[in-house]
């Protein structure tokens, strides 16, 4: 019986690994509206990372939205978006619509189903061209996992209502272009980070060794935007996060042994949008998240939490707290 259970566990693990495997493809689209004809349904279903060059239109975006169920990363930074008019674009219910050239179409990655707007939940990162002029209405509305929108353009494109959510998506832009974006209408509340987004997972085998592990990976703490830490953390490690990681957008420390987050650890982290807390956390120190104004949505507090010290969430006006039970 034990052998059979082990075999079943192995097969389940293998199937899970296969389901999450990265499948990267690059296509040159010579004629707008023909993307889907360049691959089989099976290929479209398997792609997680897609790079497109050439010419696209609203028909192609509709297919990207509706027929690529595993799509996580889309790079259209070297593609040109052509004008299209008709009923086969992205607008809900097949409405006739005129889609302008180099505009990310309205409802590009969202759709209205039974009166409710639903975004593409698999989409995590999109890279847009320097030619982009507009990001149209509801283009990425409801894309709750779109953590990165990287725009190659040095001046901000026009952002239309509900096109992007500032509580979900960090905007990565060319060096020296922050002011051009920050003062543009509807861009004011987004987190802008200049340069390339950097994501990493660090495993820490001994207390106080986070810095060593980051250096071993050939990284600098200040450059990290999306960080997952697994293993052991102590106060020295939290001090490193506090003092030398100003550009954190997302942090997952759920699989660490930490039971206390020291005072002021994440205070004034102006780009921080999301955090996952340690499963066995007991104490959140004074002003730990003070003035993390972009931290939004629901923060899940493990049931093990017994103390939240003064001002821990001061200035986190967009944050909701939720007590959860985590099964070991």
Locate predicted features.
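Bacterial Sec-dependent N-terminal signal peptides
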Residues: 1-24
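Structural signature of tandem-repeat unit edges
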Residues: 23-31, 48-56, 71-87, 91-103, ...
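A short, well-structured beta->alpha microelement
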Residues: 26-39, 203-216
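A structural signal for leucine-rich repeat
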Residues: 64-67, 88-92, 162-165, 241-243, ...
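Consensus positions within tandem repeat domains that build extended binding/scaffold surfaces
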Residues: 107-108, 136-139, 264, 285-288, ...
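Helix-loop-beta element that forms the nucleotide-linked donor phosphate-binding surface
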Residues: 184-189
């Amino acid at each position: 019986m034990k052998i059979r259970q082990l075999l079943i566990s192995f097969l389940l693990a293998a199937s899970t690994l296969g389901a999450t495997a990265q499948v990267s493809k690059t296509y040159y689209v010579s004629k707008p509206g023909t993307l889907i004809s360049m691959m089989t349904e099976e290929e479209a279903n398997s792609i997680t990372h897609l790079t497109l060059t050439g010419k696209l239109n609203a028909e192609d975006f509709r297919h990207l939205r509706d027929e690529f169920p595993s799509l996580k990363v889309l790079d259209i930074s070297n593609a040109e978006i052509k004008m299209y008019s008709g009923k086969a674009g992205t607008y809900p219910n097949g409405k006739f619509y005129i889609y302008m050239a180099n505009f990310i179409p309205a409802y590009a990655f969202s759709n209205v189903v039974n009166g409710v707007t639903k975004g593409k939940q698999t989409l995590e990162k999109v890279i847009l061209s320097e030619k982009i002029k507009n990001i149209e209405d509801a283009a990425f509305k409801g894309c709750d996992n779109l953590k990165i929108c990287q725009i190659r353009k040095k001046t901000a494109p026009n952002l239309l209502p509900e096109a992007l959510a500032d509580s979900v998506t960090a905007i990565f832009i060319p060096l020296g272009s922050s002011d051009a974006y920050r003062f543009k209408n509807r861009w004011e509340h987004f987190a802008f980070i200049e340069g390339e987004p950097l994501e990493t997972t660090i495993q820490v085998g001994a207390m106080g060794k986070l810095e060593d592990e980051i250096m071993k990976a050939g990284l600098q703490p200040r450059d990290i935007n999306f960080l997952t830490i697994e293993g052991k953390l102590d106060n020295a490690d939290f001090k490193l996060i506090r003092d030398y990681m100003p550009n954190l957008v997302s942090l997952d420390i759920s699989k660490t042994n930490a039971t206390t987050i020291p005072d002021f650890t994440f205070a004034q982290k102006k780009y921080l949008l999301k955090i996952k807390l340690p499963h066995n956390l007991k104490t959140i120190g004074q002003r730990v998240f003070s003035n993390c104004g972009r931290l939004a949505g629901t923060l899940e507090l493990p049931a093990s939490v017994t103390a939240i010290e003064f001002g821990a969430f001061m200035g986190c006006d967009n944050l909701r707290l939720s007590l959860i039970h985590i099964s070991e």
